[in-house]
């Protein structure tokens, strides 16, 4: 795992924690001043943001540790655990918002000075957009699952702040139920995002295979290589930033062992050029012993 990856994901986690802390202080004041249930929803979400981002920061640092005697495949799965923990945090906040929205829908209460809430929400919206932009850039560079989960979380915050702006504006014009209705809608959306995030984390923990397009690229690299007659038993998974790739190459029976080994090394390097940092295991099989049943990839 290269130093650039560790530096970027750590900075993304620190930035998220710092931003969530700043927004929490701003929203506490805004809620105290206006009494808006939508701002209360945003405040609770910021509390969850801090917990999730702190968890993310600690777990990311752990996941960056190199492989050791007890964890020979590294610590990358800790990122999936962080994403799963975040989904639980977010689900809890969504339930709280939903219940609070119902309570205020039954007994709507006019808020004080919605203008202050609007200003605070605009500030929160701008700050969150800046954070999401930075996280998206980090995800493109690292493919970190933990940072991607955090980014999805803050993307939902962008939509939430937009909805809060609209709710505050409507409340300013006398429609006090709008505040509670938007809190309900925000809670439903956040719950959906949490469930989706949790599903992706569980799939990673269950060693889901790499995406179809990446597997096809691996097959194309292998089967187009000189000296390779075909391939079978491709197995893939991902742990943190590391892809694990296993495949059997089919070679002519008459090919000397040393030459077969050289071809396998060349194929491995070709895969690593396309997927840097991967853990690649290649086994060579003579064509005469390859079973004709099962998953095979032959030359076209």
Curated annotation (Swiss-Prot):
Record keywords: Cell inner membrane, Cell membrane, Ion transport, Iron, Iron transport, Membrane, Metal-binding, Transmembrane, Transmembrane helix, Transport, Zinc, Zinc transport
Q: Where does Zn(2+) bind?
A: 45, 49, 153, 157
User: Could you give a single Gene Ontology term from the biological process aspect?
Assistant: intracellular zinc ion homeostasis
Recorded topology in the membrane: Multi-pass membrane protein
Q: Where, by residue number, does the polypeptide cross the bilayer?
A: 12-32, 39-59, 82-102, 114-134, 151-171, 172-192
* Quaternary state and interactors: Homodimer.
For this chain, the family text in UniProt reads: Belongs to the cation diffusion facilitator (CDF) transporter (TC 2.A.4) family. FieF subfamily.
Protein name (record) = Cation-efflux pump FieF
* Organism from which the protein derives: Escherichia fergusonii (strain ATCC 35469 / DSM 13698 / CCUG 18766 / IAM 14443 / JCM 21226 / LMG 7866 / NBRC 102419 / NCTC 12128 / CDC 0568-73)
